[in-house]
Regions:
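N-terminal pre-ligand scaffold of iron-sulfur
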Residues: 1-69, 103-114
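Short boundary motifs at domain starts and secondary-structure transition points
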Residues: 6-9, 127-132, 154
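Hydrophobic structural packing positions in well-ordered secondary structure
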Residues: 24, 55, 102, 151-154, ...
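Short cysteine clusters
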Residues: 55, 74-77
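Iron-sulfur (Fe-S) cluster-binding segments and ferredoxin-like electron-carrier domains
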Residues: 61-69, 80-92
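Short amphipathic alpha-helical segments
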Residues: 67, 86, 151-153, 177-178, ...
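FAD-binding core/adjacent interface of flavoenzyme oxidoreductases
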Residues: 75, 84-108, 112-139, 191-256
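Beta1-alpha1 glycine-rich phosphate/pyrophosphate-binding loop at the start
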Residues: 133-204
């Protein structure tokens, strides 16, 4: 092959030697640079693999996390990722990590990245959308991460029926911890997914709607406005709310 005419796939890739094969022992990981891209290199169960170096939740450096078997746990909030596939396996966080090719040759470890994906730090798992002719309906009561993860998991496992998420919040699922970290946040900065995302994957989000009763015999729920909604399967994921218990002091000797 002419050395000046490389295959298009090779032209789009960047490969660099990042370390010696003996630099990492089994169960160890380190950050390496491929071009200007930080990559997490992992040696697990006798095999090298490479994934994105930052958690898809709040961008924490995963090299400071914990590696157990084929899973690395984020040091900030405990999100877990598979070091072989990059898939997220435990919340918090919704997105998976990019993966990179690894080759061990003559005692050296090489990592290959796609030049067009150098700026990508996370990815969405492949999902299907809704087929209108399928009438089967799964109703999710609650607008938090649990309901959203359920909806996405259904689409990732090729469920093509109707998905309805009902929440009394004014917004679709959003990142509530951010509310305690800054004032005057822009609405779009706290949403877990955009409106386009829900439309693309056929996930209906009904905001400012409240379910007040469930009829499991007829498989229907009653809304606060008196309307009824039928379902085939139901998930209640409304979370919990702190209930404060007050103790009043009767005398100076009593404790509050």
């Amino acid at each position: 092959m002419d050395q000046y005419h490389q295959p298009a796939e090779e032209e789009d890739e960047l490969t660099e030697m990042v370390c010696q094969e003996t630099d990492l022992k089994d169960g160890q990981m380190k950050e390496v640079m491929v071009g200007e891209k930080k990559v997490l290199l992992v040696c697990s169960q006798g095999q090298y693999s490479a994934i994105g170096s930052q958690c898809s939740h709040y961008n924490a450096p995963l090299v400071k996390g914990t590696l157990v078997g084929q899973r690395v746990r984020c040091p900030f909030h405990g999100a877990c990722f598979n070091v072989r596939t990059g898939d997220i396996e435990e919340y918090p966080g919704l997105d998976s990590l990019p993966t990179y090719k690894v080759k061990v040759e003559n005692g050296m470890v090489y990592v290959t990245v796609n030049k067009h994906a150098l700026k990508l730090t996370k990815r969405v798992k492949e999902m299907c959308s809704r087929i209108a002719d399928i009438k089967h309906t799964i109703l999710l009561i609650g607008g938090g991460p649990a309901a959203l993860v359920c909806a996405e998991t259904l689409r990732q496992t090729c469920y093509e029926g109707r998905i309805i998420m009902v929440t009394r919040d004014a917004l679709p699922p959003f990142d509530k911890p951010k509310l305690s970290k800054a004032l005057h946040l822009d609405r779009s900065s706290i949403l877990l997914r955009s409106a386009d995302f829900y439309q693309q994957y056929g996930i209906e989000v009904w905001t400012e709607k409240e379910v007040i009763s469930v009829n499991t015999v007829n498989k229907a729920v009653k809304m606060i406005d008196g309307t009824w909604l039928n379902y085939d399967q139901l998930l209640i994921a409304t979370g919990c709310r702190l209930k404060l218990k007050y103790h009043f002091r009767k005398s100076k000797k009593d404790f509050i």
